[in-house]
Amino acid sequence: MNFENLLIEVGTEELPPKSLRKLAESFLSNFTDELKKAELSFESAVWHAAPRRLAICVNQLALAQADKVVEKRGPAIAQAFDTDGNPTKAAMGWARGNGITVEQAGRLKTDKGEWLLHQAKVVGVETKSLIAAMAQRSLDKLPIPKPMRWGNNTTQFIRPVHTVTMLLGSEVVEGELLGQKSARIIRGHRFMGKASFELVHADNYLSALKEQGKVEANYEVRKALIKAGAEAAAAKIGGVADLEDDLLEEVTSLVEWPVVLTANFEEKFLDVPAEALVYTMKGDQKYFPVFDKAGQLMPNFIFVTNIESKDPQQIIAGNERVVRPRLADAEFFFETDKKDSLESRLTSLETVIFQKQLGTIKDRVARISDMAGFIANSIDANADEAARAGLLSKSDLMTNMVMEFTDLQGTMGMHYARLNGETEAVALALQEQYKPKFSGDTVPTAPVSVCVALAEKLDTLVGIFGIGQAPKGAADPFALRRAAIGILRICVENNLPLNLIDLIAKAQELHGSNLTNDKAAEQVLEFFMGRFRAWYQDQGVSVDVILAVLARRPTSPADFDSRIKAVSHFRSLEQASALAAANKRVSNILAKVEGELPAAIDAGLLVENAEKVLAEKLNELQPQLAPLFAAANYQEALALLADLRESVDTFFEDVMVMADDEALKNNRLALLSSLREQFLHAADISLLQ
């Protein structure tokens, strides 16, 4: 079989930078799926992407499908011939449908019988005749939320398409994609190199674009060039560039020929909180800020231009002119905001509605303040500072800086609190109240910050459930799932002695008559249980371990976590499988008992040696287990219980639980109930697989 390399490039107008990687990866994934469905072999495949192009390269693609033999089974021999041995209508119809006579058919013999069989040879189709249709289907499946039309075309795509190039080796693959016929034409850089050129061979794609078109189409190479260039530029001025990957990806998707340059801004702007300056540089201008070795922002920034200039200083000066008004705005907002304290802004919070049924933002901060103080008393934090931080938690929403740069809420509150003379604990809590903001974000650990972060999330969660607006399906407009996970993570990662039932009840109390859903507490608790499951599954914890703990419905997050870790460890023990099976057996036996189970074990009714041994071992373990369970040391407790495996196995081998003698039976049920009760202190081990 012969092989060739394939190139497919779609040349477009500028593609959305934040979608470029996803589009390219999806194009490649869709196309390789098509190749596999068509049974076309290939060695490897890669994607390339730049602002005005999506491309895939397939290495060593088979030039045709392999020939194959398809077996088509006909009627059973008993139905294929009559008693005289002549073909039946069924046999002749089947043969005719396959283009043969009955006499030409073979036979298929199995242990289940014998059938007519036709082995048809299917000649493989040439690859070049399949490519265009496969490519079109691949493009049709791209994740494009809002496709557009252009010109007089009825074709839709994410951006107007100007060229399509499909080359199988040096041969142009005939066909049409997105309204454009395939040709050799490749467009180069808008302002450098050749505007367009003919590509001779698929293998030359990257090199020809680079040499003739002044385009680096290899996305990862382009990204690496930008990263290395920015690092070198920052080091040259004694700093370190902030190369956050999301911004690095976006900049990579904005340029075809990256040139890294360094610019400056006036040092006076450094009096403005660094976060505001960084937000402006990164968010608005796509610049990389530079920090010194002490972590302080420097009056410099690094940017990437899409052109090589004979006078780069002119480009630098232009970017400095562009960023200056933005920094000046931030400076003005900051200086203006400083004239009023956070406390003085509380009155203005009355004008902002949090939620129609839940009141204003001022009502909300009053609840957060009370809730933070309540939590502080429960975890030995400073209740006055927690209440103060809760009261001021939303005041920065009324500042010019946050109104202009909404992502700085909390952060600007921290800076203004420091300027107002608030304690550092209060100031830090204002910044950390929203943490964790996303999966993988850190949780607050400072006691006052913990109190406010929990209070802020609980107020939202209980309030929204309390007015009957729980999340439905994928819709979650108040981000309640994130809030619930945040609460659980803060409690677990700080090992806080808090109970969800108490927290929910206090939040309900603070909302008062605002809440109309009388089942809110129950629903919120159930919501937390669901979040527990989702969170631990994301961490790779086995579902059966999670279900074993959920069966006990622990309402303290830290306690829940201790049980998860203990059961995960227990599950890895040699004895776990047998004890899980035994627990399941015990559970089934006890479930069939009518009425109440016997309360205590009567030693005088222990007849068989196996039941005496099990009862004795249980009796010996209980004084050791009680303090372990009381201290939530479930791992050590389950390790002790694991030692019962042999005694439990022997009990079930030698003892008839449901004895005819009622007294013996009840005593044995009491023994099994006592055994199961010890395991249930940690989890329902019977659910382990």
Swiss-Prot record:
This is Glycine--tRNA ligase beta subunit. It is an enzyme of class 6 (ligase). The keyword Transferase does not apply. Its main location: cytoplasm. PROSITE patterns: AA_TRNA_LIGASE_II_GLYAB. It catalyses: tRNA(Gly) + glycine + ATP = glycyl-tRNA(Gly) + AMP + diphosphate. The keyword Nucleotide-binding applies. GO terms for biological process: arginyl-tRNA aminoacylation; glycyl-tRNA aminoacylation. GO terms for molecular function: arginine-tRNA ligase activity; ATP binding; glycine-tRNA ligase activity. It is found in: Cytoplasm. Keywords: Aminoacyl-tRNA synthetase, ATP-binding, Cytoplasm, Ligase, Nucleotide-binding, Protein biosynthesis. Belongs to the class-II aminoacyl-tRNA synthetase family. SUPFAM superfamilies: HD-domain/PDEase-like (SSF109604). GO terms for cellular component: cytosol. Its EC number is 6.1.1.14. Tetramer of two alpha and two beta subunits. InterPro entries: DALR_anticod-bd, Gly-tRNA-synth_bsu, Gly-tRNA-synth_heterodimer.
